[in-house]
Amino acid sequence: MKEKVVSLAQDLIRRPSISPNDEGCQQIIAEGLEKLGFQIEWMPFNDTLNLWAKHGTSEPVIAFVGHTDVVPTGDENQWSSPPFSAEIIDGILYGRGAADMKGSLAAMIVAAEEYVKANPNHKGTIALLITSDEEAAAKDGTIRVVETLMTRDEKITYCMVGEPSSAKNLGDVVKNGRRGSITGNLYIQGIQGHVAYPHLAENPIHKAAPFLQELTTYQWDKGNEFFPPTSLQIANIHAGTGSNNVIPAELYIQFNLRYCTEVTDEIIKQKVAEMLAKHNLKYRIEWNLSGKPFLTKPGKLLDSITSAIEEITGITPKAETGGGTSDGRFIALMGAEVVEFGPLNSSIHKVNECVSVEDLGKCGEIYHKMLVNLLDS
C-alpha cells in the first residue's frame, strides 16, 4: 500500500494547486475511483472545484474529507528542492502540500480503493468529499457540498478528515472536535481634531482604553473536560492619519475568539455589546462567524480509529480539540461523528514542508483498518 500512497501523493504535489485552484488533482483522483465503480459527482461553485464520490447505497455512510488546494510557497529559493517537485530525500517526501494535506489525501484514497477492491459488495457506503477551497476563503468548498447534500436529505454517519493531527509521532493525537471561531471588526468613533486642542476633539483611542482592558482580561469560561477555556486575541489595531498632530476620528480593532461549548456566538456578541455600552462608546461592529464548535464524544468512530492506530503504530492516541478550524465543522452540521487524523503537523505551511514516506504508508493502513472496523464488525 505504501508505494501506491506515495506515488499518488507525488502526482498530486507536482500540481501547483494554490487555493482555490485544483490544477487537475481531482481529475486524477476521480479517474481511479471511477474504474472501481464509484459514482462521481462534480460540484463546481464559482472558481472552486468539488468532488463527491460514493461507492454503495446503504448506511452507514463513511466519508473521507480532504482538500487539494495548498497555501503559497513563499520564496522558492529557500526550499531545499523545488516545492512542487515532490522529491524524496532520505525517506522524506518534500513539497508544498506533502503534510497539508495531499499526503493524507492520497492515503485515504488508496485505503478506500483497496477496501473496495477486496470488498466490492461491502455494506454501507464509502464516500469521498474533496475540495479546492479549504486554505483560503472556504466559502465555495465543503460547506457548499454539505448544503447540497442536506437539501437532498443525504446523510453522513462517520467522517474522517485527513488533516495533519499528529504532534511528535504518527498517531499520538487525533482531533475529536474543534473550537468555534468568531471575529469582531469593531469601529469606535471619535471626533477628529488638532492635538493641541483636545477639548475640541474626542480621541477614540483614549476612550476605548478601559474597554480594551476589560475585553482582553474577561474570563469567558473555564472550559470543560473536552475543551480548553475560550480565548480572545486582538489581531489588528489601526487609527490616525500617520500625522503626529491629528487626533484620529476612528479606531479600528479586530479581535478573534476561539470558543468552546460553554458559550455561544450569541452570548459572545451580547457580552461585547454590554461592555461597549458600559464604557459609553459610539461604535459599529461587524461579526464574522467562521465556525461553531463541534465535538465527537467517545463512540464507534473514535473507537475504530483509536484501535486502528494502536494496531498499526503501537501508540494509543490522545483525543484533543485544540488548534485552528477545519472543514470538519461543516460536516458536523449534518449530525455526523467527525474525527481528524493525519501525519505530523510540524512542517505545515512552512518552507520545506515534508512528510515521512513510512508515515504515509502507515496512514493508508490506518484508514483502511478503520474501514474494516466500521464495516466488517
From Swiss-Prot:
Zn(2+) 1 binds at residues 67, 100, 163. The active site is at residues 69, 134. Keywords: Amino-acid biosynthesis, Cobalt, Diaminopimelate biosynthesis, Hydrolase, Lysine biosynthesis, Metal-binding, Zinc. Pathway: Amino-acid biosynthesis; L-lysine biosynthesis via DAP pathway; LL-2,6-diaminopimelate from (S)-tetrahydrodipicolinate (succinylase route): step 3/3. Its EC number is 3.5.1.18. Gene3D superfamilies: 3.30.70.360, Zn peptidases. It catalyses: N-succinyl-(2S,6S)-2,6-diaminopimelate + H2O = (2S,6S)-2,6-diaminopimelate + succinate. The keyword Metal-binding applies. NCBIfam families: dapE_proteo, PRK13009.1. This is Succinyl-diaminopimelate desuccinylase. It comes from Haemophilus influenzae (strain PittEE).
